[in-house]
Amino acid sequence: VSHWLAVITQTLVLLLSGAALFLSSWIVVPAPTMSLLPLGVGAPEVSPWLVMINAIASLLVLVTIRRTPWQFLALAASLLALLLSVLPLLQMPATQQHLAAAMRDGLGDYSVNLPSSQQKRMRQQPFVLADVFRGINPGESRYTSGIVFSQPDGVPLSMDLYRPPQVGNYPALIIIYAGAWRSGDPTQNADFSRYMAARGYSVFAIDYRHTPRYRFPAQLDDVRAALAFIHQHAAEYEADPERIAIVGRSAGGHLAMLAAYEPDALPVKAVVSYYGPVDLPGGYANPPRPDPIDTRAVLETFMGGTPATMPDRYRLASPISYVRRSLPPTLFVHGSRDNLVQLKFIQQMHQRLLADGNTSVLLEIPWAEHAFDAVFQGLSNQLALYHTERFLDWALR
């Protein structure tokens, strides 16, 4: 009995070591398919958990397995997994310094006029290790769902509204969700919406029509309609129409920039784009490798053709085409490991904005993949949240 118990124990430890190495490997290995992308997104964000698991696995290997080739293999796997899982934490101090410098370079001494009452509501540190384990409390807010703002082609489009606990007149955030223009709904990233509402914003999470039934510019038309509706009904929903910012993720970031940058755009005070595409012809010509989402197929579905067959439409659908002077201040938050929207295009956009005299801040997170903030308490979102709320306070103050 003791022999078989030992065999079972050793087998379980070997499996634990192998599983931990498999999970930890996605911190550095790009996901080749959409089915594996959640591992590439999540592994860096929960890496402190993986550090703990890998440390335990290493100890169990030493304690439970005799000196055999299997033990050395299991120990090597556990130690390699431990090394991989600790990489984001090792990068954290330098990353915090780089992000703080990027904020100062873009905004100057932005915290000088930050009211102490507002600062107390914000995160006090860019990164708190304990929050990875215990989570981040979004705080209290009022929630109203299903506010219909438009019915294009008879399709009702609605928004969800998050407001601070007390009635008032607040700066407004328009939240546009991700989903490659083909999926998603306003309930995505609800923790972020609740968090910002609890800290003094009226937050409108809006819907838009999807491909393949509706192609560009239908999605942009829907964002315009939402923006016009919010301007018209601002008092009813406790929003200050003079202090509106648009926050978008991925496809939503793309739409946010277009809605803010177009020459005839309704006025907004700031734009925040989390990993949003900016150059559609460039992205089509130079897709990432590997390309888990099949970039060209997504763009062809969204646009209704290729850049060769409809170059003007691709140009009009690219935020980089609208760069000129006097655009709203823009914050880009992007992962260096983003394998859907490549960082190099965002860097080009950032430099173009600066060259034309605009305010632009680019926060690059070295270990982060696309959609990193899907893990709300993860390493990357803690950094993003800390700086995003300060950028928005600066822009909407």
Language-model features, listed with the residues they occupy:
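Primarily recognizes the serine-hydrolase "nucleophile elbow" in alpha/beta-hydrolase
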Residues: 26-30, 225-288
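Short beta-strand element of the alpha/beta-hydrolase
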Residues: 169-179
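N-terminal cap/lid segment of alpha/beta-hydrolase-fold proteins
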Residues: 23-54, 58, 114-167
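Conserved alpha/beta-hydrolase "acid-adjacent" motif
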Residues: 339-348
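Catalytic nucleophile-loop/oxyanion-hole region of alpha/beta-hydrolase
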Residues: 45-46, 184-193, 204-243, 262, ...
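Hydrolase active-site cap/lid region
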Residues: 106, 110-125, 257-312
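Catalytic active-site module of serine/aspartate enzymes centered on a nucleophile-bearing elbow/loop
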Residues: 379-397
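Short beta-strand/loop motif that positions the catalytic acidic residue
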Residues: 326, 332-334, 338
